[in-house]
Amino acid sequence: MLKLFYKKRETDEDLSRMAWDLLETACLKEGVLHPRDRIIYGKNGKPYLEGNGLYFNLSHSGDYALCVLCDTEVGCDIQRVRKPRASVIDHWFSTKEKDYILCGGSEGDRAERFTRIWALKESYIKQTGEGLSRDLRSFCFAFEGEEPVLYLLSDSGTERVSGLAFYEQKLDGYACVCCFKKQLTSL
C-alpha cells in the first residue's frame, strides 16, 4: 500500500503544519486515531507511527505539502522545479548525474532533470532514516529507460541497490518522489 496525500496552499498557511494536518487526515482514512500521540523518533530523528505497521513521511516545497502512507519504510520528497546551480551540481552530484542533468535540451529540461535527481536523493535518505547525516555523494542515480536505479559509491567500487522502488509523479511544476521497499503489494 502506498498512498499519497497532497494539498496546495491557498493562503499564507504554514506548509509544515499543512503536512502534519495531512497526516492526521490520511491516518483517519486508515482508521488510525490521534496519530500525533503515537509518534516515536528513530536515531536520526525520523518520525514513526508506533505499533500499527503503518509508515509515513512528510515533505513540502513552494506551495505544496505532501504526506505519504505506506506499509513499508517510506521516504518522500516534493520539490518545485528549479534551475540547476553549477555549485550545487558540482558539490552534490556524481559525474553520471551531472551528465544526465546537463545532457542537452532546453533550460527547462535541465531544470526538470536536476529537480528529479534531487527529489530522488532526498526520498532515499528519508526512507533510510539517515537524512542529511548521509553524504549525498555516497550514492548516485542512473536510469534504465526512465526507471531510476540506485548505486552506492565507495572507494572499493559501485554497488547496485536492490529491494527499493521509486514512485515518481509530476505535479504542476513540481517533482514528487516516494522511495519504499519493493515488498509493497499495490499502488
Annotated model-derived regions:
Residues M1-L187:
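Core catalytic alpha/beta fold that binds nucleotide/phospho-ligands
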